[in-house]
Swiss-Prot record:
Belongs to the complex I subunit 4L family. Keywords: Cell inner membrane, Cell membrane, Membrane, NAD, Quinone, Translocase, Transmembrane, Transmembrane helix, Transport, Ubiquinone. This is NADH-quinone oxidoreductase subunit K. Its EC number is 7.1.1.-. It is a multi-pass membrane protein. GO terms for biological process: ATP synthesis coupled electron transport. It comes from Phenylobacterium zucineum (strain HLK1). The lineage of its organism: Bacteria, Pseudomonadati, Pseudomonadota, Alphaproteobacteria, Caulobacterales. It holds the Pfam family Oxidored_q2.
Length: 102
């Protein structure tokens, strides 16, 4: 049995659903929301690479690498902001973060 496009799309759909479910279920913890967004981006990357291989085009793989780079930068900046916020407030929650002034 070979692994085809439908298998990759099913895995990506499951990861995307878990990511969206994580955002809706846990709205209090910013770190869980950040990890859920990363899961959604991973599902998008799996779709990009799967369709790129299926269609025989390299553009999807290049775009997936670009999305991975942006996701890594987003995670690094987000975690740096959260660490600074935790040091100042002592708590990381969405309610406290909405009161940030800048």
């Amino acid at each position: 049995m070979t692994i085809g496009l439908a298998h990759y799309l099913a895995v990506a759909a499951i990861l995307f659903t878990i990511g969206v479910f994580g955002i809706f279920v846990n709205r209090k913890n910013i770190i869980v929301i950040l990890m859920s967004i990363e899961l959604i981006l991973l599902a998008v990357n799996i779709n990009l690479v799967a369709f790129s291989v299926y269609l025989g085009d390299v553009v999807g793989q290049i775009f997936a690498m670009f999305v991975l780079t942006v996701a890594a930068a987003e995670a690094a900046v987000g975690l740096a902001i959260l660490v600074t916020f935790f040091r100042n407030r002592g708590d990381i929650s969405v309610d406290d973060a909405s009161m940030m002034k800048g």
